[in-house]
UniProtKB/Swiss-Prot annotation:
GO cellular component: small ribosomal subunit
Assembly and binders: Part of the 30S ribosomal subunit. Contacts proteins S8 and S17. May interact with IF1 in the 30S initiation complex.
Organism of provenance: Corynebacterium efficiens (strain DSM 44549 / YS-314 / AJ 12310 / JCM 11189 / NBRC 100395)
This protein's record includes keyword Ribonucleoprotein: yes
Stated name of the protein: Small ribosomal subunit protein uS12
Gene Ontology terms describing biological process: translation
Keyword list, A-Z: Ribonucleoprotein, Ribosomal protein, RNA-binding, rRNA-binding, tRNA-binding
UniProt-listed Gene3D superfamilies: Nucleic acid-binding proteins (2.40.50.140)
Length: 122
């Protein structure tokens, strides 16, 4: 416990809250280039091959981003738009790629929740 004199000299400092999406540098989304597109397996109770891309953002940081939806057209050097949002069963994946923006196509034959997957109404 500091003395009153120590508080007069130094004061108290607020703790800064840690940001979950630091690589976006305060932006809602960030553009990036895929450096690697691959599949990975989820944590213990689940079993699948989750589609993930390694993306170099315009902020200069390289992050792992999840590719949501069934099927995708991404490959190395594809331009993608990345938003925040982690994938609970993939450790270290804290970003998602926005479907239907830049080089990423929307999900084909999607009928419900279309806006999340960049699917047109037709």
């Amino acid at each position: 416990m500091p003395t009153i004199q120590q508080l007069v000299r130094k004061g108290r400092h607020d703790k800064t809250a840690k940001v979950a999406t630091a690589a976006l540098k305060g932006s809602p989304q960030r553009r990036g280039v895929c450096t690697r597109v691959y599949t990975t397996t989820p944590k213990k109770p689940n079993s699948a091959l989750r589609k993930v891309a390694r993306v170099r953002l315009t902020s200069g940081i390289e992050v792992s981003a999840y590719i949501p939806g069934e099927g995708h057209n991404l490959q190395e050097h594809s331009m993608v738009l990345v938003r925040g949002g982690r994938v609970k069963d993939l450790p270290g994946v804290r970003y998602k790629i926005i479907r239907g923006a830049l080089d990423t196509q929307g999900v084909k034959d999607r009928k419900q929740a279309r806006s999340r997957y960049g699917a047109k109404r037709g």
